[in-house]
Amino acid sequence: MYEALPGPAPENEDGLVKVKEEDPTWEQVCNSQEGSSHTQEICRLRFRHFCYQEAHGPQEALAQLRELCHQWLRPEMHTKEQIMELLVLEQFLTILPKELQPCVKTYPLESGEEAVTVLENLETGSGDTGQQASVYIQGQDMHPMVAEYQGVSLECQSLQLLPGITTLKCEPPQRPQGNPQEVSGPVPHGSAHLQEKNPRDKAVVPVFNPVRSQTLVKTEEETAQAVAAEKWSHLSLTRRNLCGNSAQETVMSLSPMTEEIVTKDRLFKAKQETSEEMEQSGEASGKPNRECAPQIPCSTPIATERTVAHLNTLKDRHPGDLWARMHISSLEYAAGDITRKGRKKDKARVSELLQGLSFSGDSDVEKDNEPEIQPAQKKLKVSCFPEKSWTKRDIKPNFPSWSALDSGLLNLKSEKLNPVELFELFFDDETFNLIVNETNNYASQKNVSLEVTVQEMRCVFGVLLLSGFMRHPRREMYWEVSDTDQNLVRDAIRRDRFELIFSNLHFADNGHLDQKDKFTKLRPLIKQMNKNFLLYAPLEEYYCFDKSMCECFDSDQFLNGKPIRIGYKIWCGTTTQGYLVWFEPYQEESTMKVDEDPDLGLGGNLVMNFADVLLERGQYPYHLCFDSFFTSVKLLSALKKKGVRATGTIRENRTEKCPLMNVEHMKKMKRGYFDFRIEENNEIILCRWYGDGIISLCSNAVGIEPVNEVSCCDADNEEIPQISQPSIVKVYDECKEGVAKMDQIISKYRVRIRSKKWYSILVSYMIDVAMNNAWQLHRACNPGASLDPLDFRRFVAHFYLEHNAHLSD
């Protein structure tokens, strides 16, 4: 906003006015500090005034007191020094005299030094009341006044009154029928208020309402009392400190009928331009009169775009010795050819509406009193996260210990399910019905008579499972007799029937597809699989989150460091043994949901989604492990707020300037050496360890102790016994292989039959994963007499082909 400069200005004949622009960050800083202090004060009062009668017993009373104290002091956000400062501040405010306590408590204080500053300001009575402006109307009595123009809304200007300033409220006159008439008479008292808005918003076109001029006058005594009551005590200490440092100089002179100049006593002085008759009338009555300009009959309205452009021209001027004049008039009788040739005091001067810039050479006074203001620099992006504070100590996690009982696995053990029943926990009747219905719907849309049944669909799945451990170059060879006699397949389903069903296999309605989802044709099946996987997943403490690959040479996705490097990338959350709990095919980062946090990135938001999936089973302290693609200090802080523990390797550019030992320097140390730091605000540890190589890890739950002794190999593959290994490294090594174990199991007996549809490879992947999960449950339910993955798959494939053979005839 623009605000009148309270300091001296050069005196010249053009009546130029110098104003300053307020800092637009005032309101944001004040609102955030006042809101935080207000919330903290409420928590303190609730803690101090808590009554024993509010609880139902001593145990509950103690728990509520502890919770209220936690909400007040917030130990997870404040250090010990900050908590001590809060307690000292509270006691300091308590011992103050009663007449000072109400004055001090109106400020959002955060430390004792701020309270002392407020008390000193109250005692000395010195304080900056903001940048203010007033207007003197020339006349016999010279009453100080401030003009307020009704109908004008300048978003770039805000004036605040000095104590004791009389206000004048003016509105433009109606279009006169003859000569201008003088306006006089008593007027009720009122105060002028100008709207204060952001200076970067678009300027609003000033418009004067065609109403008769009205004048509101206050005496100096009444105005002084009103302003003294409000004063500036409502401003916070931070806002007052900012008042003198964030102003930008601009120029403005509002003179539809008058000129405004800055006098040496720092007050606006309005010079009234009237005719000789009106001057005589003003002298006789002893009251200042304002000239009412008639409407120009042949004037041309000024376009809104032009008005806004002129306002923006003045607003964007660089500070310095810049002085400008702005003439604002009603758009109803404003034109670009407004002149003052008919006025006796200034016949030669011609000025256009909202135009005219001049530079004052008389700037010696300003240079003596004010420092040079540099041009506005480009704003740098400021992170919303506070600066990290690192300390070298071990972590002290406050997570509860793991004590959950897996009742679902106990029920499966008691039921003693066979491999087929375990597989159908995931491909249940609901899933088969979904596939059958969508396949028949798709075939009918193509005018194909199919009418496939659930029994036939199970036969098709039996052939697909059989192809995983009995491979042929062509799928037609499963029905040949010459050298690959497969009576089991021939008796189960005819070749042409299999080809017809397999070519029309479908999983979603083409009439209701989400174009933003790349895998919309598989989305119903993916949701059904994720629901069943989570329903029967073992309830464990540790889980692994990583990337997997579904082999497909038509894909342009590449993943280095995996057995399968080309295909579809899939995000997987598994147990430490390889049971898949949740998966999601990779899509571009542009497909992220609106409610996801952009600061966490794609990998961080995927981990948060997996954590939410686990928390659906219960609020347990799960422990997630993942690699450096996902890990960041912000992610571990967000997981800690959800009550989820996490550990992972971290990249160098995500350590938040943690002062760990340099990698090159650590290579000169002995193997087993490690360095670590704690982030004090969120209690997150970073550790760099030199073992087989140098790795950096981050955790919100596991620290250094206990330190273990392990063996490793050097560069020549020679074993080095007994080197130190922190506990954080041990936990990560034990939990990081979950996804790799799943990939290893399903890679041995993958489904080999594929169709021409691009998503058939993903359907085969889901069948293999369901078989892996069923085998994991089989091994957990029968630890001593379990089948290996091959025998388990053969059992399911033979069952589907044998028990549904007669249905295809």
Curated annotation (Swiss-Prot):
Q: Which domain of life is it from?
A: Eukaryota
Q: InterPro entries attached here?
A: PGBD (IPR029526), PiggyBac_TE-derived (IPR052638), SCAN_dom (IPR003309), SCAN_sf (IPR038269), SRCR (IPR001190)
Residues bearing PTM Phosphoserine: 360
Annotated GO biological processes are: regulation of transcription by RNA polymerase II
Gene Ontology cellular-component terms listed: membrane
Q: List the Gene3D superfamilies.
A: DNA breaking-rejoining enzymes
Q: Which residues form the SCAN box domain?
A: 44-126
Q: Name one GO molecular function term.
A: sequence-specific DNA binding
Pfam assignment, any one = SCAN
Which PROSITE patterns does the UniProt entry name for this protein?
A: SCAN_BOX (PS50804)
The protein's name in its UniProt record: PiggyBac transposable element-derived protein 1
Species name: Homo sapiens (Human)
Kindly list the organism's lineage. Answer: Eukaryota, Metazoa, Chordata, Craniata, Vertebrata
Q: Which gene encodes it?
A: PGBD1
